[in-house]
């Protein structure tokens, strides 16, 4: 089970080289070790931010998805010696996890406010920790190797409504006892997240909350060359060249409200 990554887009947008070293090259090291030592199944935890990424974190997780899937297909085709089955799970925010909005809102309410929301229209998908764990384990059990499993996250939640509801449940009134302050979208932040790109379709599984994304297949050797190049760029802190390469390999990566937007115009 691989859940090691820098998951916060704010940190990775400011430290893109670390994002590539940990999220991309780190995943490759762990995946290669799994093959070397004959691990039966390798389950990678991905994110909805990997879909049509608008920030470094999302693109780095998409590259990690691409690597493990290409490695799995290379094993199936006999191009790489091994028996490990690689399975990817992709889902959104987990309620109550470190850095999630609910603990932050609770702290802000306890301190008398204001409760900060980046944009009045921003929406996110949520699931509970037990539900996320259960679906990851079930996807890992049903996977045969090379799949990207997408979870049914239910209806998206408007973050402003969540903030308002938490304030009311605390016995206070918005605008009277406590304010909601809109701070503006941060670099790389989307108004809404997607679980699938417009180029992906899904296939049903026997589980009503789990589907398989039908994604483009990448050649393992091409992916390996790309990751080697990205790793060298990151070690030498050649940020512009590194991000440019990320955008060329994942062409749907379009930066938003970020210093890297200029690379989309070249």
Regions found by a protein language model. Give the residues of each.
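A short, exposed helix-loop element centered on a Lys and neighboring polar residues
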Residues: 31-32
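Active-site helix of classical SDR
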Residues: 60
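Strand-loop microenvironment adjacent to phosphate/nucleotide-handling motifs in alpha/beta enzyme folds
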Residues: 36, 66, 70-266
């Amino acid at each position: 089970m691989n859940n090691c990554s820098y998951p916060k887009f704010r940190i990775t947008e400011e430290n893109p080289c670390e994002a590539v070293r940990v999220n991309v090259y780190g995943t490759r090291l762990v995946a290669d070790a799994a093959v070397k030592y004959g691990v039966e199944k390798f389950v990678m935890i991905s994110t909805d931010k990997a879909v049509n990424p608008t920030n470094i974190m999302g693109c780095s997780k998409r590259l990690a998805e691409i690597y493990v899937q290409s490695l799995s297909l290379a094993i199936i085709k006999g191009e790489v010696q091994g028996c490990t089955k690689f399975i990817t799970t992709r889902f959104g925010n987990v309620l109550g996890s470190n850095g999630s909005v609910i603990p932050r809102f609770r702290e802000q309410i306890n301190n008398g406010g204001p409760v900060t929301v980046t944009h009045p229209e921003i929406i996110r998908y949520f699931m509970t920790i037990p539900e996320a764990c259960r679906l990851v384990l079930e996807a890992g059990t049903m996977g045969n190797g090379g799949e990207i499993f997408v979870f049914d996250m239910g209806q998206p939640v408007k973050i402003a409504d969540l903030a308002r509801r938490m304030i009311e449940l605390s016995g206070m009134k918005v605008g009277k006892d406590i304010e909601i302050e809109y701070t503006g979208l941060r670099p790389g932040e989307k108004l809404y997240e997607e679980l699938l790109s417009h180029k992906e379709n899904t296939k049903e599984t026997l589980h009503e909350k789990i589907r398989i994304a039908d994604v483009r297949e990448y050649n393992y050797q091409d992916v390996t060359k790309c990751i080697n190049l990205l790793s060298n760029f990151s070690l030498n802190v050649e940020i512009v060249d590194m991000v440019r390469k990320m955008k060329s390999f994942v062409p749907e990566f379009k930066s938003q409200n970020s210093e890297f937007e200029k690379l989309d115009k070249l």
